[in-house]
Amino acid sequence: MTANDLWIPRSKRLKRPYQPRYNRDCFGELIQIDGSYHDWFEGRAAKCCLLVYIDDATGKLLHLRFCEAETTFDYMLSTRAYIEQYGKPLAFYSDKHSVFRVNQKSSQDSQITQFGRILNELNIDIIFANSPQAKGRVERANRTLQDRLIKEMRLEGISSIAEANAWLPCFIEHFNQKFAKCARNSKNLHRPLTESDAELEDIFTWQEPRKVTKNLTITYDKCIYLLEPTELNHKLAGQY
Protein backbone atom coordinates (compact mmCIF):
# COMPACT_ATOMS: atom_id res chain seq x y z
CA MET A 1 0.00 0.00 0.00
CA THR A 2 2.90 2.34 0.76
CA ALA A 3 4.56 1.57 -2.59
CA ASN A 4 1.33 2.38 -4.42
CA ASP A 5 0.84 5.60 -2.44
CA LEU A 6 -2.36 4.24 -0.90
CA TRP A 7 -1.06 4.86 2.61
CA ILE A 8 1.53 7.31 3.91
CA PRO A 9 3.40 6.55 7.15
CA ARG A 10 2.77 9.12 9.88
CA SER A 11 6.46 10.07 9.97
CA LYS A 12 6.35 11.07 6.29
CA ARG A 13 3.08 12.95 6.31
CA LEU A 14 3.18 16.68 5.78
CA LYS A 15 2.71 18.60 8.98
CA ARG A 16 -0.51 20.52 9.11
CA PRO A 17 0.10 24.28 9.10
CA TYR A 18 -1.60 26.20 11.90
CA GLN A 19 -2.60 29.54 10.49
CA PRO A 20 -2.83 32.47 12.91
CA ARG A 21 -6.22 33.59 14.13
CA TYR A 22 -6.73 37.33 14.39
CA ASN A 23 -7.55 38.58 17.87
CA ARG A 24 -11.06 39.86 18.45
CA ASP A 25 -11.73 43.58 18.22
CA CYS A 26 -13.56 44.32 21.48
CA PHE A 27 -12.98 43.78 25.17
CA GLY A 28 -15.35 41.08 26.43
CA GLU A 29 -15.98 39.63 22.97
CA LEU A 30 -13.99 36.43 23.61
CA ILE A 31 -12.43 35.24 26.88
CA GLN A 32 -9.88 32.43 26.70
CA ILE A 33 -9.97 30.08 29.70
CA ASP A 34 -7.57 27.32 30.64
CA GLY A 35 -6.12 25.40 33.56
CA SER A 36 -2.36 25.12 34.07
CA TYR A 37 -1.19 22.27 36.34
CA HIS A 38 2.30 23.00 37.63
CA ASP A 39 4.60 23.07 40.66
CA TRP A 40 3.60 26.66 41.33
CA PHE A 41 5.05 26.78 44.85
CA GLU A 42 8.38 25.15 44.00
CA GLY A 43 7.92 22.35 46.51
CA ARG A 44 6.65 24.58 49.35
CA ALA A 45 3.20 23.10 48.70
CA ALA A 46 1.75 20.35 46.53
CA LYS A 47 1.40 20.79 42.77
CA CYS A 48 -1.86 22.46 41.87
CA CYS A 49 -3.80 24.06 39.03
CA LEU A 50 -4.09 27.72 38.10
CA LEU A 51 -7.31 28.70 36.31
CA VAL A 52 -6.63 31.53 33.86
CA TYR A 53 -9.20 33.87 32.25
CA ILE A 54 -7.68 36.24 29.67
CA ASP A 55 -9.32 38.66 27.25
CA ASP A 56 -8.59 37.88 23.60
CA ALA A 57 -8.69 41.47 22.37
CA THR A 58 -6.48 43.12 25.00
CA GLY A 59 -4.46 40.32 26.58
CA LYS A 60 -5.68 41.45 30.01
CA LEU A 61 -5.67 38.89 32.78
CA LEU A 62 -9.21 39.07 34.10
CA HIS A 63 -9.24 36.27 36.65
CA LEU A 64 -6.72 33.91 38.23
CA ARG A 65 -7.47 31.27 40.83
CA PHE A 66 -5.43 28.44 42.30
CA CYS A 67 -7.19 25.15 43.01
CA GLU A 68 -6.15 21.56 43.65
CA ALA A 69 -7.43 20.30 40.28
CA GLU A 70 -9.21 21.47 37.12
CA THR A 71 -12.76 20.53 38.13
CA THR A 72 -16.27 21.65 37.25
CA PHE A 73 -16.83 23.06 40.73
CA ASP A 74 -13.67 25.17 40.53
CA TYR A 75 -14.72 26.56 37.15
CA MET A 76 -18.14 27.31 38.65
CA LEU A 77 -16.52 29.37 41.42
CA SER A 78 -14.18 31.18 39.03
CA THR A 79 -16.85 31.91 36.41
CA ARG A 80 -19.27 33.28 38.98
CA ALA A 81 -16.56 35.52 40.43
CA TYR A 82 -15.69 36.66 36.91
CA ILE A 83 -19.21 37.60 35.80
CA GLU A 84 -19.94 39.32 39.12
CA GLN A 85 -16.90 41.52 38.54
CA TYR A 86 -17.11 42.19 34.79
CA GLY A 87 -20.52 41.04 33.56
CA LYS A 88 -21.23 38.39 30.94
CA PRO A 89 -18.86 38.12 27.95
CA LEU A 90 -20.13 37.10 24.54
CA ALA A 91 -18.16 33.83 24.55
CA PHE A 92 -15.57 31.72 26.30
CA TYR A 93 -12.84 29.94 24.32
CA SER A 94 -11.57 26.66 25.78
CA ASP A 95 -9.97 23.35 24.94
CA LYS A 96 -11.98 20.13 24.81
CA HIS A 97 -11.54 19.22 28.47
CA SER A 98 -14.37 17.11 29.87
CA VAL A 99 -15.42 20.04 32.06
CA PHE A 100 -16.47 21.91 28.93
CA ARG A 101 -17.57 19.20 26.50
CA VAL A 102 -19.01 15.67 26.61
CA ASN A 103 -16.25 13.65 24.95
CA GLN A 104 -17.62 10.12 25.44
CA LYS A 105 -21.24 9.96 24.44
CA SER A 106 -23.64 7.27 25.63
CA SER A 107 -27.38 6.86 25.72
CA GLN A 108 -27.41 7.60 29.45
CA ASP A 109 -25.18 10.69 29.40
CA SER A 110 -26.38 14.22 28.94
CA GLN A 111 -25.22 15.85 25.73
CA ILE A 112 -24.11 18.93 27.67
CA THR A 113 -21.81 19.28 30.67
CA GLN A 114 -22.75 21.08 33.87
CA PHE A 115 -20.49 23.96 32.85
CA GLY A 116 -22.10 24.05 29.41
CA ARG A 117 -25.55 24.18 31.00
CA ILE A 118 -24.50 27.10 33.19
CA LEU A 119 -23.22 29.08 30.21
CA ASN A 120 -26.39 28.27 28.27
CA GLU A 121 -28.56 29.62 31.09
CA LEU A 122 -26.41 32.75 31.25
CA ASN A 123 -26.58 33.17 27.44
CA ILE A 124 -22.79 32.87 27.05
CA ASP A 125 -21.42 30.95 24.08
CA ILE A 126 -18.50 28.53 24.35
CA ILE A 127 -16.12 27.83 21.46
CA PHE A 128 -13.79 24.83 21.47
CA ALA A 129 -10.23 25.10 20.19
CA ASN A 130 -9.08 22.25 17.97
CA SER A 131 -5.42 22.54 19.02
CA PRO A 132 -3.20 24.24 21.63
CA GLN A 133 -1.97 26.55 18.86
CA ALA A 134 -5.52 27.82 18.36
CA LYS A 135 -5.62 29.24 21.89
CA GLY A 136 -2.16 30.71 21.72
CA ARG A 137 -2.87 33.77 23.89
CA VAL A 138 -3.76 31.79 27.01
CA GLU A 139 -1.00 29.23 26.33
CA ARG A 140 1.58 32.03 26.12
CA ALA A 141 0.14 33.57 29.27
CA ASN A 142 0.55 30.24 31.05
CA ARG A 143 4.23 30.09 30.10
CA THR A 144 4.75 33.67 31.25
CA LEU A 145 2.98 32.98 34.54
CA GLN A 146 5.02 29.84 35.14
CA ASP A 147 8.06 32.10 35.16
CA ARG A 148 7.00 35.50 36.48
CA LEU A 149 4.25 34.44 38.91
CA ILE A 150 6.40 31.74 40.50
CA LYS A 151 9.27 34.18 41.10
CA GLU A 152 7.00 36.83 42.61
CA MET A 153 5.32 34.33 44.96
CA ARG A 154 8.77 33.21 46.08
CA LEU A 155 9.72 36.82 46.87
CA GLU A 156 6.41 37.35 48.70
CA GLY A 157 6.92 34.17 50.75
CA ILE A 158 3.62 32.70 49.55
CA SER A 159 3.41 28.96 50.22
CA SER A 160 -0.26 27.97 50.05
CA ILE A 161 -3.27 28.18 47.75
CA ALA A 162 -5.18 30.37 50.22
CA GLU A 163 -2.33 32.89 50.51
CA ALA A 164 -1.86 32.95 46.74
CA ASN A 165 -5.54 33.51 45.95
CA ALA A 166 -5.70 36.41 48.40
CA TRP A 167 -2.67 38.04 46.75
CA LEU A 168 -3.50 37.38 43.07
CA PRO A 169 -5.60 40.55 42.48
CA CYS A 170 -2.49 42.62 43.24
CA PHE A 171 -0.45 40.54 40.78
CA ILE A 172 -3.14 40.85 38.08
CA GLU A 173 -3.14 44.65 38.37
CA HIS A 174 0.63 44.91 37.95
CA PHE A 175 0.69 42.30 35.17
CA ASN A 176 -1.94 44.15 33.13
CA GLN A 177 -0.15 47.48 33.54
CA LYS A 178 2.91 45.91 31.96
CA PHE A 179 1.53 43.56 29.30
CA ALA A 180 -2.07 44.47 28.38
CA LYS A 181 -2.77 46.49 25.25
CA CYS A 182 -5.68 48.50 23.90
CA ALA A 183 -8.35 46.75 21.86
CA ARG A 184 -8.87 47.82 18.25
CA ASN A 185 -12.40 48.86 19.18
CA SER A 186 -12.97 50.62 22.51
CA LYS A 187 -16.44 49.12 23.01
CA ASN A 188 -16.93 46.84 26.01
CA LEU A 189 -19.09 43.86 24.99
CA HIS A 190 -19.64 42.52 28.50
CA ARG A 191 -23.36 42.48 29.24
CA PRO A 192 -24.79 43.48 32.64
CA LEU A 193 -25.48 40.69 35.10
CA THR A 194 -29.24 40.87 35.60
CA GLU A 195 -29.73 37.65 37.55
CA SER A 196 -30.39 37.95 41.29
CA ASP A 197 -28.21 36.24 43.89
CA ALA A 198 -30.90 33.59 44.37
CA GLU A 199 -31.04 32.93 40.62
CA LEU A 200 -27.24 32.66 40.45
CA GLU A 201 -27.25 30.22 43.37
CA ASP A 202 -29.70 28.06 41.42
CA ILE A 203 -27.73 28.32 38.15
CA PHE A 204 -24.36 27.53 39.75
CA THR A 205 -25.45 24.24 41.31
CA TRP A 206 -24.98 20.70 40.08
CA GLN A 207 -28.26 19.73 38.42
CA GLU A 208 -29.32 16.24 37.36
CA PRO A 209 -32.81 15.49 35.95
CA ARG A 210 -34.58 12.69 37.81
CA LYS A 211 -38.12 11.37 37.40
CA VAL A 212 -40.46 11.32 40.37
CA THR A 213 -42.18 7.93 40.54
CA LYS A 214 -45.82 7.43 41.49
CA ASN A 215 -44.52 6.29 44.88
CA LEU A 216 -42.88 9.70 45.32
CA THR A 217 -39.31 8.44 45.08
CA ILE A 218 -36.32 9.53 43.03
CA THR A 219 -33.11 7.63 42.35
CA TYR A 220 -29.69 9.25 42.29
CA ASP A 221 -26.22 7.72 42.49
CA LYS A 222 -27.63 4.26 43.36
CA CYS A 223 -29.68 5.66 46.25
CA ILE A 224 -33.45 6.00 46.54
CA TYR A 225 -34.81 9.18 48.10
CA LEU A 226 -38.34 9.41 49.52
CA LEU A 227 -40.29 12.63 49.06
CA GLU A 228 -42.73 13.77 51.71
CA PRO A 229 -46.31 12.90 50.66
CA THR A 230 -47.46 16.51 50.46
CA GLU A 231 -50.07 17.83 48.04
CA LEU A 232 -47.38 19.64 46.05
CA ASN A 233 -45.16 16.55 45.78
CA HIS A 234 -48.09 14.39 44.62
CA LYS A 235 -48.45 16.76 41.65
CA LEU A 236 -44.82 16.02 40.71
CA ALA A 237 -45.39 12.28 40.21
CA GLY A 238 -44.32 11.24 36.72
CA GLN A 239 -42.43 14.49 36.10
CA TYR A 240 -38.73 15.30 35.89
Question: Where do the model's predicted regions map?
Answer:
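Charged alpha-helix within mobile-element recombinases
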Residues: 108, 114-184, 189-201
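C-terminal, beta-rich DNA-binding module of retroviral/retroelements integrases
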Residues: 172-240
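Active-site beta-loop-alpha junctions of metal-dependent nucleic acid enzymes
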Residues: 46, 64-91
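Acidic/histidine-rich, metal-coordinating catalytic segments
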Residues: 83-108, 132, 188
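Basic, flexible linker segments flanking DNA-binding modules
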Residues: 1-33, 38-39, 104, 110-113, ...
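Short, solvent-exposed loop/turn segments at secondary-structure boundaries
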Residues: 44, 65-66, 103-108
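Mobile genetic element proteins and their domesticated derivatives, centered on retroelements
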Residues: 1, 34, 53, 59, ...
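An active-site-proximal beta-strand-loop segment
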Residues: 33-62, 72
